[in-house]
Curated annotation (Swiss-Prot):
Substrate binds at T15, A16, S17, G18, K19, T20. The lineage of its organism: Bacteria, Bacillati, Cyanobacteriota, Cyanophyceae, Synechococcales. GO terms for molecular function: ATP binding; tRNA dimethylallyltransferase activity. Transmembrane segments: none annotated. This is tRNA dimethylallyltransferase. ATP binds at G13, P14, T15, A16, S17, G18, K19, T20. The gene is miaA. It holds the Pfam family IPPT.
């Protein structure tokens, strides 16, 4: 790969691994901005449940692709990729590339590997019909139509399930047969975080999310939008919604959120090890190791 290509740094890892903290430290040291690659942080008002960087943190370091749309306006992978590539192209001209931070594997791959998602626009009427069928039925439909996609998408992930079905019904072909790739105009250095005490960190963060007002945020979102909104069924929000509906108490919700998050982190680990090849940062103080790897990559 030509050394003349600019270096794009990606910081990846499972949820609660410490990406936000390290990203802020790296951004301040290197005087770079951050490009968000967390699919839920794209949405306005979903702050507590996604552990979105605080307003103070966003003032310290410029963040791109946060708060793009309302939660009832889904963003496809293709739309995310187009928005991200516009920012990257501008920063490339300025010779000040941001670095990618997030745990949404497919979104990362779209930027680091030049993944080309199918150009199928959202179809609100179809999504409404699929929503009426229920997520369990939708995932069964996907298993029949595109078994490969179904094996990669969690049974509870309504947004990605509907998107995969949308592509199948619009084109007559599985989404997994239509995702090509083309080399991006940059070199990529992937740094991975996967601390040994991740389970403990997940438990602590989940408790903190509820202390920070996850139930209150969910109640506000459910009043502003339909409580059947797919994003309100995702980890954390789904359990908080059940507290509001009287189906769970707070302690049960925390326990269930913790368990679902641990299961999600396991899937993230599997994805990153199969689809990416990061330098896994070791030790309790990854900043110095990350800086050394970045400086070596810039040479």
């Amino acid at each position: 790969m030509p050394a003349s290509k600019p270096l794009l740094i990606a910081l990846l890892g499972p949820t609660a691994s410490g990406k936000t903290c390290l990203a802020l430290q790296l951004a301040e040291q290197l005087k770079l901005s951050v490009l968000n690659v967390d699919s839920r942080q794209l949405y306005i008002g979903m702050d507590v449940g996604t552990a979105k960087p605080t307003k103070e943190q966003q003032r310290r370091v410029q963040h791109h692709l946060i708060d793009l749309r309302r939660p009832d306006q889904p963003i496809t992978l293709q739309e995310f990729q187009a928005a991200a590539q516009l920012i990257l192209a501008q920063k490339l001209r300025e010779q000040n590339m941001p670095f990618l931070v997030g745990g949404s594997g497919l979104y990362l791959k779209a930027l680091t590997c030049g993944l080309r998602p199918p150009a199928v626009p959202p179809q609100p009427e179809l999504r409404k019909q699929l929503g009426e069928l229920g997520q369990r039925t939708c995932h069964h439909l996907l298993q029949a139509a595109d078994p490969t996609a179904a094996s990669r998408i969690a049974p509870a992930d309504a947004m990605r399930t509907k998107r995969a079905l949308e592509v199948v019904y619009a084109t007559g072909k599985p989404i997994t047969t239509q995702q090509g790739s083309s080399p991006p105009p940059w070199r990529v250095l992937e740094l991975g975080l996967d601390p040994h005490n991740l389970r403990e960190r997940i438990g602590q963060r989940t408790t903190q999310l509820y202390a920070n007002g996850l139930i209150e945020e969910t109640e506000h979102l459910s009043q502003c939008y339909d409580s059947d909104l797919p994003l309100l069924q995702t980890i954390g929000y789904g359990e908080a919604l059940k507290v509001i509906q009287g189906l769970l108490n707070r302690e049960q919700a925390i326990a269930l959120t913790t368990r679902r998050t641990q299961q999600f982190a396991k899937r993230q680990r599997t994805w990153f090890r199969r689809q990416h090849h990061p330098y896994w940062l070791k030790g309790e103080e990854p900043l110095s190791e990350a800086l050394s790897l970045i400086q070596a990559g810039l040479r």
